[in-house]
Amino acid sequence: MNYFHYPHKIALEGGDSLPSITIAYSTYGTMNADKSNVIWVCHALTANSEAAEWWAGLIGSGKVIDTEKHFIVCANILGSCYGSTGPLSINPITEAPYYSSFPLVTIRDMVKAHILLREHLGIEKIFLLMGGSMGGYQAMEWCIMENDRIGQLFLLATSATESAWGIAIHTAQRLAIEADQSWQSASAEGGANGLKAARAIGMLTYRNYNIMVARQKDPDSDKLDHYKASSYIQYQGDKLVQRFNAMSYWLLSKSMDSHHIGRGRGGNTALILKDIIQKTLLIGINSDILCPIAEQQFLNRHLPNANLVVIDSNYGHDGFMVETSIISQHLANWMGK
């Protein structure tokens, strides 16, 4: 992992600012002489910059995103807790962690930081910009903000705006965090129980009825407690608490809520999408209840050069992370055209 420190004030879309920022990022492979082999991966909500680890089925030597052929970049987003400036970072003005005083950031603010890193790395054009879920939000915004620097787009399980359904889910998750009285305490562990509950809510939308019944149904019909499904959800909550922070989760859920490519651009999402002329591969997942295929179908109707593939998966929204074999096949076929 590498770190880029930008020592100047950065204005945020909501009117606040940060006195300086640090961006944690990872790179794989080598940039070629004419810098034409750059692939930039935008990550989702609780991921980090180590894309070759959490998307190992797609990225690596000999994989469809080949580290022997491409120069791959992934940057941790503003507001996260994996090295980039966020609630746990030290405010250079107060010399103490931001904690709950960290300002709201939008997807556009995250992309603004990505652009600063792009400039720092000397990248003039991105051959392929890709992301799933919240990563897709960043990719679309970036393509609008720097259209002439993006070659192709690969978007998975994502949408042009955050849906009312998504906002409602995020609100429920924030209510869970806010119910934990420790969540705004001056501590990295603040809100841990609330974060666990928020993750539990999220898991119900990342998966679905079919996969939960198939994987977590109890064979013992005489049980009165300690059900397999309950243990699974508890485990997922505990696992996230070990690696993430309630303040970042609360903040980034707000970032997702504000995702709307039409904001400040006239509001006509369909019209704005028509300006994204890049060759685009869209992946939708037939069992996704968080960002259903209707969202990708909308993108497909209004992006001039899009191709939509709907994959069969039992894993719902998480399919964009799990189904790397079939996704790799579709991406390889598309890139070869």
Segments from the language model and where they lie:
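N-terminal cap/lid subdomain of alpha/beta-hydrolase-fold enzymes
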Residues: 26-92
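Short beta-strand/loop motif that positions the catalytic acidic residue
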Residues: 276, 282-284
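Alpha/beta-hydrolase-fold enzymes
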Residues: 149-151, 155-239
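Catalytic active-site module of serine/aspartate enzymes centered on a nucleophile-bearing elbow/loop
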Residues: 297-298, 305-337
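Cap/lid segment of the alpha/beta-hydrolase catalytic domain
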Residues: 63-116, 167, 171-182
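Conserved hydrolase catalytic core segment
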Residues: 125-164
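Catalytic-loop region of hydrolases
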Residues: 1-38
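Conserved alpha/beta-hydrolase "acid-adjacent" motif
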Residues: 289-295
